[in-house]
């Protein structure tokens, strides 16, 4: 029994954990929520529908943020918002949005 417990402790201690703190994700998402949490919100100049991000898969959100950051997706506001985000910021934000509806 001691050997099993010892093995589990070694595995847990040596396994890297990528963790997204819900509070941190919400805090980092405050700017995003202004547009992406409003049902049926339309942006102006040009007019287009802003997607609601609650419940969206985190991998998709991270991919989109990286594309805006690199200029592969075109939108001035999104490029400006994404350009200052670290990889950990993107993980925290994406995991927060995935966790809400």
Enumerate the predicted regions with their spans.
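C-terminal capping alpha-helices of c-type cytochrome domains
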Residues: 59, 70-73, 81-101
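Gly/Gly-Pro-rich "capping" loops immediately C-terminal to redox-active cysteine motifs
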Residues: 37-67, 79-81
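Sec-dependent signal peptide recognition
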Residues: 2-10
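The canonical Cys-X-X-Cys-His
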Residues: 30-38, 93
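Sec/Tat signal peptide C-region and signal peptidase I cleavage site
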Residues: 16-22
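Short sequence/structural segments immediately N-terminal
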Residues: 22-30, 40-44, 71-75, 100-101
């Amino acid at each position: 029994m001691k050997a099993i417990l010892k093995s589990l402790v070694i595995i847990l201690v040596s396994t890297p954990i990528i963790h997204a703190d819900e509070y941190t994700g919400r805090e980092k998402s405050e700017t995003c929520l202004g547009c992406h949490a409003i049902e049926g919100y339309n942006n102006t100049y040009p007019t287009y529908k802003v997607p609601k991000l609650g419940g969206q898969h985190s991998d998709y959100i991270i991919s989109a943020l990286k594309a805006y950051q690199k200029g592969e997706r075109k939108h001035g506001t999104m490029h400006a918002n994404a350009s200052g985000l670290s990889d950990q910021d993107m993980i925290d934000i994406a995991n927060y949005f995935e966790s809400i509806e």
